[in-house]
Curated annotation (Swiss-Prot):
FAD binds at residues 5-36. It catalyses: 2 reduced [2Fe-2S]-[ferredoxin] + NAD(+) + H(+) = 2 oxidized [2Fe-2S]-[ferredoxin] + NADH. This dioxygenase system consists of four proteins: the two subunits of the hydroxylase component (HcaE and HcaF), a ferredoxin (HcaC) and a ferredoxin reductase (HcaD). Pathway: Aromatic compound metabolism; 3-phenylpropanoate degradation. It comes from the Bacteria. This is 3-phenylpropionate/cinnamic acid dioxygenase ferredoxin--NAD(+) reductase component. One of its GO terms (molecular function) is 3-phenylpropionate dioxygenase activity.
Length: 410
């Protein structure tokens, strides 16, 4: 009996890890990966960090260059797909080539959610999603520049930190570093994925670094001239050399939509990463999961891309699905490393340590059960915290925040 052929569509973290997971879980059939990027699949998190800070940064590949050939995975880079061929099981490229598939994994990722008012600025406006975006930004984040960033989510704050650090490192004694202003519609920073005490810490951290953060505000009018003139809802006018925005994502779902798969700013999948077509799976930023209660949930993180790649591979091969660890992601801002794990909801967080010393852990207890945590420059503690959250361990709050008691002894 001829082995089936699996095609992966996409060139990012989820796509590469799906290929790796399929081989690791025993799939020996024909395996193809199609990507519109010419690079080998590379890590996205460094784009807002080291790719902006280093003078000659190198892309960090998800898998070693020799892995693809050694594992007999056929890479098709720099190609454009015309249709997935849901009915015919024939993927068609714009160059006329067609490729048969028995199962399909879609990991086309997402793009920056558009902001037409700023997109009209053309090359003077920046978003960050690909290596080319980081290369363009690296060139313009120079001393003396005025930089306006729209959006104070994770990417917006990382960009603010990187812009401040890069210009400070490059300036001469007579030059000033970038003047960075962040505009945020909400009343706080990182409102979607950080608890209140961490939001307050990050706001203060950026302000101390010289970043101006304007909350409860938005751009109403833009005039393009020698500098970009931005008029805000508050009535204030800003002058900018560089304008960057990051206000969320827009899933790259067009191919799926044209194939009549269920979409809702993302390809709708179940908890096995299966779409409404049992032969088609999806994962990473392009996917949105329908939970048991019918709600749609998207998790935009490096780890989620890895997890869904493993889940989809197991489901495609008819194997038991791996157990999911608690959600986890990290953010590097200035010299700080913050790691977020578990449930970020709720207002009653406990703090172990002193954030003013840039070393602390915030804990989220629900009826004594640890359900979430954030570490500030305490990454070594994530491993035991992950185990505690997975096991539903209960704690005495006073003992948990007592620095005289080692966490590992609890």
């Amino acid at each position: 009996m001829k082995e089936k052929t699996i095609i992966i569509v996409g060139g990012g973290q989820a796509a590469a890890m799906a290929a790796a997971s399929l081989r690791q879980q025993g799939f020996t059939g024909e395996l193809h990966l199609f990507s519109d990027e010419r690079h080998l699949p590379y890590e996205r998190p460094p784009l807002s960090k080291s790719m902006l800070l280093e003078d000659s940064p190198q892309l960090q590949q998800v898998l070693p260059a020799n892995w693809w050939q050694e594992n007999n995975v056929h890479l098709h880079s720099g190609v454009t797909i015309k249709t997935l061929g849901r009915d015919t099981r024939e993927l068609v490229l714009t160059n006329g080539e067609s490729w048969h598939w028995d199962q399909l994994f879609i990991a086309t990722g997402a793009a920056a959610r558009p902001l037409p008012l700023l997109d009209a600025l053309g090359e003077r406006c920046f978003t960050l999603h690909h290596a080319g975006d980081a290369a363009r930004l690296r060139e313009v984040l120079q001393p003396e520049r005025s930089v306006v960033i729209v959006g104070a989510g994770t990417i917006g704050l990382e960009l603010a930190a990187s812009a401040t650090q890069r210009s400070a490192a490059q300036r001469s004694a007579a030059q000033r570093r970038c003047k960075v202003t962040v505009i945020e519609l909400a009343a706080t920073v990182m409102g979607r994925n950080a608890p209140p005490p961490v939001q307050r810490y990050l706001l203060q951290r950026h302000q101390q670094a010289g970043v101006r953060i304007l909350l409860n505000n938005a751009i109403e009018h833009v005039v393009d001239g020698e500098k970009v003139e931005l008029t805000l809802q508050s009535g204030e006018t800003l002058q900018a050399d560089v304008v960057i925005y990051g206000i969320g994502i827009s899933a790259n779902e067009q191919l799926a939509r044209e194939a009549n798969l269920d979409t809702a700013n993302g390809i709708v999948i179940d908890e096995a990463c299966r779409t409404c077509d049992p032969a088609i799976f999806a994962g990473g930023d392009v996917a949105i999961t329908r939970l048991d209660n019918g709600a749609l949930h998207r998790c935009e993180s490096w780890e989620n891309a890895n997890n869904q790649a493993q889940i989809a591979a197991a489901a495609m091969l008819g194997l038991p699905l791996p157990l999911l660890p608690p959600p986890w992601f990290w953010s590097d801002q200035y010299s700080d490393n913050l790691q977020f794990i578990g449930d970020m909801r709720g207002d009653d967080w406990l703090c172990r340590g002193n954030p003013e010393t840039q070393k602390a852990i915030w804990f989220n207890l629900q009826n004594g059960v640890l359900i979430g945590a954030v570490t500030l420059n305490q990454g070594r503690e994530i491993r035991p915290i992950r185990k505690w959250i997975q096991s539903g361990k209960t704690f005495d709050a006073k003992l948990l925040i007592d620095e005289n008691i080692a966490l590992k002894s609890l």
